[in-house]
Amino acid sequence: MHKFGFLKKSSELNVMCIGAHSDDIEIGCGGTILKLIDEIRKVQFNWIVFSGDETRKKEAEKSKDAFLPKNKVKKFDIKNFRESYFQYTGDSLKDYFEELKTLSPDLIFTHYRNDAHQDHRLISDLTWNTFRDNFILEYEIPKYDGDLGVPNLFVHLDESIVQKKINYILDIFKTQKEKKWFTEDTFRSILRIRGVESNSPSRYAEAFHCRKIVL
């Protein structure tokens, strides 16, 4: 598979990571985040989570500290929108997105437009409605709904990054342990499948839906 790299070590990159819930960013693009930190010297992250009770907020902050060195954090914010009820607070959500717009990110990670979870879909829609001239990648979250699509952009991940991502997720998000799908084999399997699809030399990859790109 042909590769096209548009980022260099000397690049300056302002990244925004958007998640409806406190583990979404890590599951969807945690490996890519770790790879960007390794490969891009001047990368900064805006880490935005839209919901979480006090326990989940503590998990989100601990996770942010694990994934991001302090000097790479431009903005970190956890909102308190009610989980699964985002659609009923659309005006407040939209107002907050207008605030985020002023951060002018170069690259945005957000939810998949066709995600079966209603909170995820709304966050994806508002991302596209707000950021009309930015590079947006939609990540995927495995779940009971069976809504994984056919992604078209892949980031190859070394085994060390794969293991680090999985360890962080399982060690930090203790509140999710009762979910049967929240296991190492789930997270590793989806990375392995995407690695097969993109002929990854390391066997693993994260995958994204890229709807618009200008070369």
Residue ranges of each PLM-predicted region?
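Active-site beta-strand->loop->alpha-helix modules in alpha/beta enzyme cores, enriched
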Residues: M1-K143, G149, T186, I190-N199, ...
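Short, well-structured alpha-helical patches and their helix-loop capping segments
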Residues: Y112-D119, L157, I161, K179
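Short, amphipathic C-terminal "tail helix"
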Residues: S202-L215
